Structure formats: C-alpha cells, structure tokens
C-alpha cells in the first residue's frame, strides 16, 4: 500500500501520526504561520519520508525558486517538489530544468510534477524526470485539463503502460497529488500489479475537509460535490468532537479504498 498523508488543521496537529504516514508540508505556509512552521520543522527532523510542496495548487503558481531553495535548506525534507505550472507542459519543464541547473543540492531528493494537455506530454514529463534522476514523479488529480478528474490518472497509467512503459530509461516511483473524489483510489487499486507497485505515495486532504463539512465517505466515495474549501485557508478552524469523529471515520474508509 502506498504511503498516505492527509493535510490537517492545527486542531489535529497532536494526532498527526494517527492521520498520516508522513508529513506533507505546504511551502508557502512556512513563512505565514509560525505555529505551522515550528510544528513541521520538528516533524521533518525525524521523518523517514517527507514532502515539502511548492504550493502551486494553493497559490496558482509555485513559490519563487530562491525561496523554495532556502526552505529546502532550512527544513531539510527528504523530498522537495520542483516548481511547476498547472496544465502547462512547456513552462513546467523549463522551470524544472532551471531549478535543477541553478539550485540542485547534492543529497536532496526531488519530486517532479507532470503537467500537460495530452497523455503524450505527461509521458514526456516522466521521461525527462527519469533522465534527470528525479526520485519521484507526481501525477496531479487534474492531470489533463477538462477531463474526468475521477478517472484520468487511472486511464493515463493504463495508456502509459501500454505505450511507454519500460523504454530503457528506468521505472518511475509515482506520487498522486490530491483527488477530486476519493472513489478514484478504488480505480487505482484495480490497476495491474506492476502499476500499483509503482505508486509510492499519495496525499489528499479530502477525508479531513469532507469530515469537517459533514460529508461521509461511503462505499462509492463522495456522493456530494467536492467542497470548495482548501486546507491552507482553514488552518485555524475549530472542530467539534462530532467533526473529529467523522474525519477519522472518513480516514478509515479512505484507507479501505487504497488497501
């Protein structure tokens, strides 16, 4: 089973290790919230696996390269997400190339995010990151714009396996970034055993956010529309015991999709 992380508000910081297998840190929040920064600085000191994200999804664009580099030096995650631009293949590869040429640190492992308009462009991203020896390759939930975000990653992986798998460059380790509906992971779990074995980790705040808004995950995922709330905008939310109970129920259900 892949390693799972669910981003959490401060009210659940003391239960982080019940929620997540590893810390997933939003880079832009480290300079905005001292409590968040202090908590994750301590977490990253002992984590065997950790991700410091460039916050492109939250901000609309990655935090500046120099800032990302400095955060990597200060917080020392095992993996740093290279700068990307949502749904922009050319700029994502230009940004990744610039960062690796100007800021690459020996011993620091990186995650490269695939962006593009077609499966072919996503596959080209994978090939580039493999050639650059980027350790993990991330597939965002909105992999191809205006596609069915519940099925697009499973469809892509099946296409990639049939058309681009094992072309002599090497095999990737995949990270799945976010989700539209957690039921997607039932589809992911139905992939062939080789593809499932390439999925190293995933992150999503879905069980947490749906829990606090009152949505219960069922056998077919989320039947309500995806909440518009983002974890980064709700760090200080206060949670009732009823909300906490539903969050943990959702987390248990989510893991049943993945296992």
Provide a role label for each language-model segment.
Residues 12-13, 33-37, 119-123, 153, ...:
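Short, well-ordered alpha-helical microsegments
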Residues 1-104, 193:
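Non-catalytic, usually N-terminal nucleic-acid engagement modules in DNA/RNA processing proteins
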Residues 53, 112, 129, 188:
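Conserved, mostly hydrophobic/aromatic
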Residues 5-11, 30-31, 54-57, 84-87, ...:
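Active-site beta-loop-alpha junctions enriched in small/polar residues
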Residues 1-14, 66-72, 81, 90, ...:
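Alpha/beta catalytic cores of nucleotide-metabolism and tRNA/nucleoside-modifying enzymes
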